[in-house]
C-alpha cells in the first residue's frame, strides 16, 4: 500500500511541497527499517 502512495505522490509533480513530502516519506521509511530487527 505504501508503494502505491509513493507512486501517487510522484505522479503529482506539480505539488509545490513535493520535496517536503518525499523527505517525510523517506524519514518514515527509515524509521520503519530501523524498527525491523
Curated annotation (Swiss-Prot):
The lineage of its organism: Eukaryota, Viridiplantae, Streptophyta, Embryophyta, Tracheophyta. It comes from Solanum tuberosum (Potato). Belongs to the complex I NDUFA5 subunit family. Accessory subunit of the mitochondrial membrane respiratory chain NADH dehydrogenase (Complex I), that is believed not to be involved in catalysis. Complex I functions in the transfer of electrons from NADH to the respiratory chain. The immediate electron acceptor for the enzyme is believed to be ubiquinone. This is NADH dehydrogenase [ubiquinone] 1 alpha subcomplex subunit 5. Its main location: mitochondrion. InterPro entries: NDUFA5. GO terms for biological process: respiratory electron transport chain. Complex I is composed of about 45 different subunits. It is found in: Mitochondrion inner membrane. Keywords: Electron transport, Membrane, Mitochondrion, Mitochondrion inner membrane, Respiratory chain, Transport. It comes from the Eukaryota. Signal peptide: none annotated. It is a peripheral membrane protein. One of its GO terms (cellular component) is mitochondrial inner membrane.
